[in-house]
């Protein structure tokens, strides 16, 4: 055998032996990313509201879809932000209503249920008994049917109107809430009224009166 080939063969053999005996290379450690805690979004639960000027000591809670738009001594109104829904807490002890015929301002009726049923500007259902915040009251659903916009209820800082539009109203009259007559008024478009009733029930359930 050629000496050069023999030497190359021997060198290759020795190289293979050295390679087989050498320790295997240790792979570089893989970096593990730090664990990130998932972001927790706080739920938007009902928030209590209590007026500083309202004559009754009342607390009412509502969610992010509602907000207070009236804050008077005799009226707090909670309204839907996205929909034309209103829940008004009217202290009517000294309020006046509009006579449906003459339009004159007259004292709030002693027998409101009979008055609203005889009012030609409304088509009213039969009254039912309800309880709000532990106080018994009378509930009447009614549909305004005026031919033009008219005044209805006068409060100290504002008033309620009836309009010739497809609306439905719910009256809840509590005759004695710590010495005051309180008329809770829910107004919503006719096609949204049932939904408004359901979603506003939690507002009514949250009401608390204190002395």
Which role does the model predict for each range below?
Residues 3-94, 128, 135, 163-166, ...:
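N-terminal targeting sequences that direct proteins away from the cytosol to non-cytosolic compartments
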Residues 21, 96-100, 148-151:
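Functionally engaged cysteine thiol sites
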Residues 93-109, 120-122:
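Structured domain cores in non-transmembrane regions
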Residues 104-112, 195-199:
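Short amphipathic alpha-helical segments
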Residues 110-174:
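Signature of long, low-cysteine stretches enriched in small and polar/charged residues
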């Amino acid at each position: 055998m050629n000496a050069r080939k023999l030497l190359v063969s021997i060198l290759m053999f020795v190289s293979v032996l050295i390679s087989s005996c050498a320790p295997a290379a240790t792979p570089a450690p893989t970096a593990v990313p730090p664990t990130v805690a998932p972001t927790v979004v706080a739920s938007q639960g009902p928030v209590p509201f209590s007026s500083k000027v309202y004559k009754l000591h009342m607390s009412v809670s509502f969610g992010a879809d509602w907000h207070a738009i009236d804050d008077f001594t005799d009226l707090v109104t909670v309204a839907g932000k996205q929909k034309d829904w209103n829940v008004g807490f009217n202290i009517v002890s000294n309020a006046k209503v509009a006579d449906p015929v003459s339009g004159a301002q007259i004292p709030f009726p002693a027998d409101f249920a009979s008055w609203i049923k005889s009012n030609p500007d409304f088509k009213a259902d039969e009254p039912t008994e309800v309880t709000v915040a532990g106080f018994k009251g009378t509930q009447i659903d009614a549909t305004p049917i005026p031919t033009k916009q008219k005044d209805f209820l006068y409060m100290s800082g504002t008033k309620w109107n009836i309009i010739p539009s497809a609306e439905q109203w719910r009256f809840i009259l509590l005759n004695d809430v710590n010495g005051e007559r309180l008329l809770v008024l829910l107004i919503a478009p006719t096609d949204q009224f049932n939904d408004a009733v359901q979603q506003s029930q939690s507002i009514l359930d949250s009401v608390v009166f204190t002395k």
